[in-house]
């Protein structure tokens, strides 16, 4: 018996009412973009608005949309979005609805609460995890903090006319972390070890050549790993000390002075890891896979050297239209893989005269 075809499906709720059937005959395309870090995830829906006798009712800005994607009834909830932009175009007449992910379940406020500026200080030796938990509680959110990030002890921090989310992003970047508000949770994880809004680790997705429609890898030594130098001030000795991560050229010296050696080392390590990751970038497209998430890990196997290996997703775009369901991915090479690529290759064996050519 022939296998039944697998059909992509979606479900869309507007203010908790199911509108899937209502928009089905008008749907031109649906695109969900999952971004790494603070960049807002976005939902874009394009509808045919060609019949003047039956124009589509304009959805109010601030309306909540809940999207689920999958195949043949096996749907996975993607997230909650707030409509913030409408576009009407012609000809033919079309309506495009754009909505951004909201960090708060059941909230029309979007990011506004986290974006309000504040002025305050955080005392020396405050653990990073305590900062995240305090801010999460202030916004009635649940903190989900990776243990390796929670234990980082901070020097004195001043939050001067700075929003809570900008302050957290600044701290996360300093220690090579990623902060993301989603679904009522404030998630802080080490870059490349991200978690879902529920706090679960994002599973590794394994891909072989048959899974992929096309791919492109860009390799560059422009930044290289090199050496990153960070400075800290030794108060008792009244002198500047340095911490080095990596080796060789190019040498990058961080301009900021740090208050303790462990803070300087963490900053240097974060910058070094970021430089190494930027040496190799991947873009690929494939049939739709809702399990591919930004900050998730890909394991490519069976490709040529330089492509096979571990990658960290920086952006995943899921598109559904009359051509089917597709996923497009942008990724950076995982730090350990990229570091291995920078090592000098073993010297080629010396060629001998009169030796006949050989083949594998």
Region roles according to the model:
Residues 134-146, 350-360:
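Long, low-complexity intrinsically disordered regions
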Residues 26, 30-60, 211-360:
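An acidic/polar, Gly/Ser/Thr-rich interaction patch typically located in mid-to-C-terminal regions
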Residues 81-89, 192-194, 311-323:
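Short, compositionally biased
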């Amino acid at each position: 018996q022939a296998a039944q075809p697998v059909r992509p499906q979606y479900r869309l709720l507007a203010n908790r009412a199911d509108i899937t059937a209502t928009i089905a005959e008008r749907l031109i395309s649906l695109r969900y973009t999952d971004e790494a870090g603070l960049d807002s995830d976005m939902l874009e829906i394009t509808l045919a608005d060609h019949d003047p006798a039956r124009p589509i009712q304009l959805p109010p800005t601030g309306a909540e949309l809940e999207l689920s994607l999958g195949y043949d009834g096996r749907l996975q909830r993607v997230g909650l979005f707030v409509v913030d932009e409408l576009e009407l175009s012609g000809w033919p007449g079309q309506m495009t609805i754009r909505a951004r992910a909201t960090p708060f379940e059941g909230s029309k406020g979007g990011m506004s609460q986290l974006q309000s500026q504040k002025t305050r200080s955080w005392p020396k030796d405050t653990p990073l995890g305590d900062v995240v938990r305090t801010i999460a509680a202030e916004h009635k959110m649940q903190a989900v903090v990776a243990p390796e990030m929670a234990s980082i002890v901070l020097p004195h921090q001043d939050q001067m006319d700075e929003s809570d989310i900008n302050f957290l992003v600044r701290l996360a970047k300093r220690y090579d972390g990623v902060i993301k508000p989603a679904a009522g949770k404030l998630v802080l994880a080490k870059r490349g070890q991200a978690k879902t809004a529920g706090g679960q680790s994002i599973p590794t997705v394994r891909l072989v050549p048959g899974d992929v429609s096309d791919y492109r890898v860009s390799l560059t030594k422009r930044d290289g790993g090199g050496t990153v130098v960070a400075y800290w001030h030794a108060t008792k000795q009244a002198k500047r000390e340095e911490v080095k991560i990596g080796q060789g050229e190019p040498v990058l010296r961080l301009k900021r002075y740090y208050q303790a050696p462990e803070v300087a080392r963490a900053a240097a390590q974060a910058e070094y890891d970021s430089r190494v990751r930027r040496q190799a970038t991947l873009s690929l497209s494939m049939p739709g896979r809702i399990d591919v998430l930004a900050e998730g890990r890909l394991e490519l196997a069976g490709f040529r050297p330089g492509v096979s290996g571990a990658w960290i997703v920086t952006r995943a775009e899921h598109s559904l239209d009359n051509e089917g369901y597709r996923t497009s991915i942008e990724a950076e090479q995982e730090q350990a893989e990229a570091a291995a690529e920078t090592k000098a290759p073993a010297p080629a064996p010396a060629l001998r005269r009169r030796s006949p050519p050989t083949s594998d």
